[in-house]
Amino acid sequence: ILASFCREEGDLDAAREIKNKSEQQKNITIIDYDGTNRNQLLEEMSRSIYIIAARFHGTILGLTAGKSVFPILYSDKTKYVLEDLGFHGEYADLRDPDSLSFENAKKNLESGYKIDVTESVQNAEKHFEKLDEFLNN
């Protein structure tokens, strides 16, 4: 799948361009996430073997689904979250064009690199419980 998370930033156009350039067009599905098709997106991601994520949410959803993920960073936000999660796999940074290569992108898939983020997800849910308590009192 190619998932567009932000039409305004050109995600959908980029997904279409990637699909059009691929020799595997018939095997590529584009999902234009619009806030109403969350289940479709999550189902498709859960069926994926490998996720190359150029958006923060794609990275987090892929890790949460227990998938091997190759993050493509565009800001330090994703980098810091990956560090907090203990991610030691390969990634690319758009600010360093040399890091973005096919050879680099396939390393996490070939090694089967995954991390378990279950504890982090549970801790995040606890933060929301505390926020709910605060807001409801």
What are these regions, as identified by a protein language model?
Residues 1-137:
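Active-site anion-handling motifs in enzyme catalytic cores
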